[in-house]
Amino acid sequence: MKEAADLFSDLKLSDSQKKIINTAGKVGREKIAPRAAQIDREACNPLENYDDLRESGIHRMCVPERFGGLGHDYATYMMVSSELGRHCGATALSFNMHASTTLWIGDMLDGLDLSPEQQAEMESLRTLHYKRIVEDGALYAQTFSEGNLAAAGKSPFGTTAKKV
């Protein structure tokens, strides 16, 4: 059987990239794919799949190494997401929100023209959020799909969370 990274054989991938892509393939085939049809049928949140992403370390793939992550870039994330999507679209789509968050508060944030005070505040927040991901297994979401959320952020959120 071919490894998942073989799908990208036309690219020069590092050993680290191959490893994380192949990990996504293995987790996808062995753990995530068997639950995909039920997740689609029930239109439910793939919580067990998130546990598998945490257990495999994929959830921290785009967290910089200095914060305890694997330090992968956007291109690597896209290849991993593609592999996850081959096994469960709901998992790949929802995991995108988490991975995007880790990228936005990482290198993308560093590219902004911020004052020293803003940089210090962002570094503090970034440290907090990366720590939650690495140490607590936190997964982040985004509110882009809320039906009543205005792009400018002027509408209230449409979801109410309840402790279960």
Predicted regions and their residues:
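Short hydrophobic/aromatic segments of transmembrane alpha-helices and their interfaces
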Residues: K2-E3, A33-P34, D113-L114
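Glycine-rich flavin
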Residues: C44-E55, H59-V164
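N-terminal capping segment at the start of a domain
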Residues: V27-A36
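Glycine- and acidic
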Residues: S9-D10, R35-A36, V63
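Intrinsic disorder at enzyme termini
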Residues: M1-S16
